[in-house]
Regions:
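Flexible "cap/lid" loop of the alpha/beta hydrolase fold
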Residues: 107, 111-114, 119-155
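Conserved serine/cysteine hydrolase catalytic core
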Residues: 197-254, 263
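The conserved beta1-alpha1 loop
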Residues: 19-23, 102, 237
Length: 343
């Protein structure tokens, strides 16, 4: 595959490299507001790359990809290769690397950080999805090479990628509908015109789950890294997300207790695009706190409570409503039950 990426910042002067990983159906364009804002700081180099089968990362002409799966494992390997061979080889040996991911990109950031510990110093999760992939192993006939499956999928695919449906899906996940611009819709639809797009779509949804670690194992590994190796973890979630609701952020915060957790409101599933000024301020504050300042309290005190009409709230993880309280009780009860049964 030809891997497309963009970079803003001075490779020679940067002390921290932030690599943004996008969600399903979008690409590098979803992070241009972060690249433009952060790349102007000579201490930071901001990157965004398109995962294979998304954005502008597609097979080269004549490339044989019959056995290639568009899956968490393949994307994990792609990100690791990108960090090692592109980012680190072009930088000084003392730089820090932070992965920042939205939705699918958030889970991918978790997966890479939990399995390639030597190349990451921190992660920032932006409404990271806790689920991706439903099959335990590959089903032989459910492949992108099966022409019957391709023909069967075609009507659904054509409707799924239509302008009307893309707009409808965006209205579900953006709290501020005025942020749904025509250029965003066009950027999402453009990659679906690739001749290989429908096969990548089929492969994406028929490929197995991540094989190395389950989601819970990823969290446990990151928790251990955070507690024992000074690995940095932060969450920056849009509170009005109808898919990855705040409850999921609360769950993650309960596992990784030292994680810094900010909630933005009003903001939906893609805060990086919908409320970029607030996200950029949070990311810059986190980088200052983690790598450029010894005074955490003083850094946080400079972060505004509201930017461009969006509130920025530091959340401690305590349950705030009946749903979060029930979920907290359930987790606590199950944990105690498991502890007593193993004793």
């Amino acid at each position: 595959h030809r891997c497309y990426y963009e970079r803003k910042g001075d490779l020679r002067k940067a002390k921290v490299h932030v690599i943004f990983l996008h969600g399903f159906g979008v690409g590098t364009f979803h992070y241009r507001k972060q690249l433009n804002a952060l790349g102007g700081d000579e201490e930071v180099c901001a990157w965004s790359m398109d995962i294979c089968g998304q954005g502008k990362s597609w097979p080269r002409s004549g490339e044989d990809v019959r056995d290639f799966e568009y899956s968490m494992d393949s994307w994990r390997d792609q990100v690791e290769y990108f960090v090692r061979e592109v980012v680190l080889k072009s930088s000084s040996s003392s730089v820090k690397v932070v992965l920042a991911g939205n939705s699918l990109g958030g889970k991918l950031a978790l997966y890479v950080a939990a399995t390639s510990e030597d190349i990451t110093d921190g992660i920032i999760l932006l409404n990271a999805t806790p689920f991706w992939g439903f099959l335990e192993k590959r089903v032989r006939f459910l492949t992108k090479e099966n022409e019957f499956i391709v023909k069967l999928t075609q009507p659904y695919w054509d409707n799924f990628r239509s302008k009307e449906n893309v707009r409808r899906l965006l209205t579900l996940v953006y709290a501020d509908k005025t942020k749904i611009e025509e250029s965003l819709i066009e950027n999402i639809i453009e990659p679906t015109e690739n001749e290989f797009a429908i096969r990548a779509f089929i492969s994406t949804f028929t490929s197995p789950k991540a094989s190395r670690l389950s989601y819970d194992e990823m969290l446990e590994t990151i928790r251990d890294r955070n507690e024992s190796m000074f690995f940095k973890v932060a969450l920056c979630y849009g509170r009005e997300d109808p898919w990855v609701v705040p409850l999921w952020g609360q769950r993650l915060k309960r596992v990784i207790k030292n994680a810094t957790y900010y909630e933005l409101s009003p903001s939906g599933h893609c805060p990086n695009d919908e409320t970029p000024e607030a996200v950029n301020a949070v990311v810059r504050s986190l980088l200052d706190e983690w790598f450029f300042s010894a005074e955490t309290a003083s850094v946080r005190s400079t972060l505004p409570k509201k930017i461009d009409g969006v509130s920025i709230e530091l959340v401690d993880g305590s349950p705030r409503n009946v749903f979060e309280k029930v979920d907290y009780w359930k987790d606590t009860f199950v944990s105690k039950l498991l502890s007593s049964s193993s004793a």
